[in-house]
């Protein structure tokens, strides 16, 4: 079972995704930008997949992905970035494996997770 860490500053989105992914059998943890040092929280959660929004309140998802890709203990992490604005090129250049344009259908996310 894959462990997925969700990072978003939208409580509603977090709860919706947590419920949908849980129903599909995934182990899900959530992380908000208010949770302190995001990198420490990612390490502590030890996920297989990180689904992260580009905009996390006062933190930037692109910067976090760049930090992950330069951290030897985290560079194996599969990263899915999401935003309501098409930032595909920026996300892939930062080190994301996949970009999802919001709103997306749950089946799109499930297909990516199964790939």
Model segments located where?
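Conserved acidic carboxylate
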Residues: 8
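Two-component/phosphorelay signaling modules centered on CheY-like receiver
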Residues: 11-29
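Acidic, metal-coordinating helix/loop segments flanking the phosphotransfer/catalytic sites
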Residues: 31-49
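Active-site residues of response regulator receiver
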Residues: 53
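The feature encodes the CheY-like receiver
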Residues: 57
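Short amphipathic alpha-helix used as the core "switch/output" element in two-component signaling
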Residues: 62-75
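Alpha4 helix (beta4-alpha4-beta5 surface) of REC/receiver domains from two-component response regulators
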Residues: 63, 85-100, 108-111
